[in-house]
């Protein structure tokens, strides 16, 4: 090679479209807990765990526990007048090896127990939680994120008890925590990300943030309201 010689380099980029399956309540029976469980069982048998699954749920109430298995999930609620997609039992998300779940537009109404039991990265948006012992918990290898959600009258609203996670989402924006025993309980949480509660409101909770793990938390742009006398 001499000075002034030109070297040409090239790369080949291969983009593969990832297949996904989508179910709409207008086309697929999912009006009852039994129908939804039957659908989930068929998905586990027939759909690869590498295939994302998107569910558009009707505005009905599902009683009993529901388990979403090892997939990337998009689970979307709906409304019809005063009716909203609602779960009254524990919803478990069990994605493995990087599979995660997104849930949006759903109400979780309980009188004890756990609302969302996450074993994978779980992203909650525009959801409501009322009446649970623990509204949403991140178990080991999991992370729970919430944005634009309401947590009312739960013993614990958000709980973290995870020593590792396949994904993180540290922005907890525009949530409302009202009348909970503990709004946010951090027992164990991996990583160094700062949990940002900008735009979130804490009102009339016995404890706003119980940070046992001493994880970094930013509440500078959160709102803290006390009960009026």
Where is each model-derived feature located?
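Short glycine/acidic-rich loop motifs that flank beta-strands on beta-rich extracellular proteins
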Residues: 62-68, 84-93, 97, 110-118, ...
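Extracellular/surface-exposed low-complexity segments
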Residues: 18-22, 33, 38, 202-205, ...
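All-beta strand scaffolds that present successive hydrophobic residues in beta-strands
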Residues: 74-77, 100-104, 122-126, 143-147, ...
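A short beta-strand micro-motif common to beta-rich folds, especially ectodomain repeats
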Residues: 1-3
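Acidic Gly/Asp/Thr-rich repetitive segments characteristic of extracellular carbohydrate-active
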Residues: 20-56
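Right-handed parallel beta-helix/beta-spiral solenoid domain characteristic of secreted/periplasmic
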Residues: 28, 34, 73-115, 126
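C-terminal edge beta-strand
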Residues: 5-17
């Amino acid at each position: 090679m001499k000075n002034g010689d030109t070297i040409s380099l090239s790369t080949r980029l291969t983009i593969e479209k990832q297949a996904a399956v989508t179910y709409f309540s207008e086309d697929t029976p999912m009006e009852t807990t039994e129908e939804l469980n039957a659908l989930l069982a068929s998905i586990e048998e027939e759909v690869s765990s590498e295939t994302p699954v998107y569910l558009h749920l009707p505005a009905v109430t599902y009683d009993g526990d529901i388990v979403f298995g090892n997939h990337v999930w998009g689970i979307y609620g709906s409304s019809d007048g005063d009716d909203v997609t609602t779960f009254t039992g524990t919803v478990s998300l069990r994605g493995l090896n990087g599979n995660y779940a997104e849930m949006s537009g759903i109400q979780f109404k309980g009188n004890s127990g756990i609302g969302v039991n996450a074993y994978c990265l779980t992203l909650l948006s525009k959801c409501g939680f009322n009446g649970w012992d623990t509204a949403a918990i991140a178990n080991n290898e999991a992370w729970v994120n919430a944005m634009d959600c309401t947590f009312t009258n739960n013993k614990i609203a958000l709980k973290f008890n995870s020593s590792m996670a396949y994904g993180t989402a540290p922005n907890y924006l525009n949530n409302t925590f009202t009348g909970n025993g503990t709004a946010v309980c951090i027992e164990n949480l991996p990583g160094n990300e700062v949990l940002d509660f900008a735009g979130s409101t804490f009102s009339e909770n016995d404890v706003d943030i119980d940070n046992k793990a001493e994880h970094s938390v930013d509440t500078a742009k959160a709102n803290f309201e006390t009960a009026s006398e």
